[in-house]
Amino acid sequence: MHAVVRNYSGAGAKQLFDLLEQRKGDVEANLRKVPGLVSYMLLRSDDGGMSVTVCKDKAGADESLKVARDWIQKDASNIHANPPVVTEGSVIVEIK
């Protein structure tokens, strides 16, 4: 499995997460199209928030980045949020 964490902070981050919460059904529908999606979480932080996506492989994780980027460009470009800091890697432990 491969995980991607997108951390949004700074200019526009709180507004972006307000919009993501308001449009969570749309966000969920778009991410469910990602091949090999295992899980997705959206978390608020003091200065914005982060998303954690786990996919069966790196190809799915890469597609999740594209889906997120495209959604923000289409539906949240007016917010002008700073780009996320992206961290990704192979999952070594999973607890269910």
Describe every region a protein language model picked out:
Residues 1-50, 56-70, 77-96:
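Short S/T/G/P-rich N-terminal loop/turn motif that feeds into the first structured element of a domain
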